[in-house]
């Protein structure tokens, strides 16, 4: 990690020294004119990751609870294998699935959300008329929402695996005691399992967030490039750090390459903080389980 950080810092120094503090606040990316910054791409990166985690986290927690508390033994092993298989699917496969299959359904979902929740700034769409049956749906395609849902499928197995492990460590004595006192299955989950696994749930969610922040291929295939500061996730266009690097690296040289390295350094630092924080929560949850045992 230290070697990677040093390499990126050395390579990015020329761009960082030229841009100065404006590197953090500039939305445009015009390295030829010396006018560039990570404000818009960092916002896009955060929005894609938040959409992904917002979709994946409830599914991951529900799946892990079902596997550890409800599913019979035979079905449990099958579900675990299916979740592990999802984690092994290459990113390009998810990206192609999102581009050619899911996007057609996603625009209808996005229009429905815009119709009922468009009064919220992040669900509004410029140029959209949700009340017109003949309105074009292209304003909803290639959006942060579509990219985020596809990335959610990629981070969900990671979150499920971590949460499943933590839920499986809930002390049997506490669960059996709750059942003996007349607790229902849902009551035991709510009163015993969820409080015990709180650290693992947070850690698993943040590990998924770290993965979502750096996802490249799927996002590059789906998201239409746009360098502007906006929080409208249903609207066409957006950008992320990893997509920017993937799109421009092959043609970049000299100062342009240094600018890309600077963007990569910023993403590296944020991802490192997120992953270390997630690991701390998970290890704390595990140590608590061992001490209780």
Predicted features and spans:
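C-terminal transmembrane helix and the adjacent membrane-cytosol boundary/short C-terminal tail
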Residues: 164-168, 172, 179, 247-253, ...
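Periplasmic/extracellular loop-to-transmembrane helix junction in inner-membrane transport proteins
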Residues: 8-52, 72-73, 131-137, 247-258
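Interhelical loop and adjacent transmembrane-helix boundary motif
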Residues: 130-136, 219-268
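Membrane-cytosol interface at the C-terminal ends of specific transmembrane alpha-helices
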Residues: 61-66, 80, 121-130, 135-180, ...
């Amino acid at each position: 990690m230290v070697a990677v950080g040093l390499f990126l810092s050395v390579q990015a120094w020329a761009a960082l020294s030229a841009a100065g503090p404006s590197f953090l606040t500039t939305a445009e990316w015009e390295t030829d004119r010396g006018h560039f910054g990570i404000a818009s791409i960092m916002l896009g990166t955060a929005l894609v990751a938040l959409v992904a985690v917002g979709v994946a986290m409830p599914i991951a927690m529900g799946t892990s609870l079902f596997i550890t508390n409800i599913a019979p033994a035979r079905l449990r092993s099958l579900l675990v294998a299916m979740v592990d298989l999802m984690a092994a699917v290459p990113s390009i496969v998810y990206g192609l699935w999102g581009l050619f299959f899911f996007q057609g359904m996603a625009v209808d979902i996005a229009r429905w959300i815009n119709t009922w929740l468009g009064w919220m700034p992040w669900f509004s769409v410029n140029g959209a008329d949700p009340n017109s049956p003949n309105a074009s749906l292209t304003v909803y395609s290639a959006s942060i929402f579509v990219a985020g849902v596809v990335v959610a499928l990629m981070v969900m197995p990671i979150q499920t695996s971590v949460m499943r492990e933590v839920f499986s460590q809930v002390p049997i004595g506490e669960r059996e005691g709750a059942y003996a006192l007349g607790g229902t299955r849902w009551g035991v989950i709510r009163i015993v399992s969820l409080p015990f696994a709180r650290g693992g749930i947070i850690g698993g969610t943040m590990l998924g967030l770290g993965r979502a922040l750096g996802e490249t291929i799927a996002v590059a295939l789906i998201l239409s490039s746009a360098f502007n500061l906006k929080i409208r996730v249903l609207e066409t266009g957006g950008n992320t750090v990893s997509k920017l690097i993937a799109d421009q690296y092959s043609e970049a040289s000299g100062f342009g390459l240094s600018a890309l390295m600077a963007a990569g350094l910023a993403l590296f630092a944020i991802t490192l903080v997120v992953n270390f924080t997630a690991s701390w929560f998970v290890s704390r949850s595990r140590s608590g389980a061992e001490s209780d045992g």
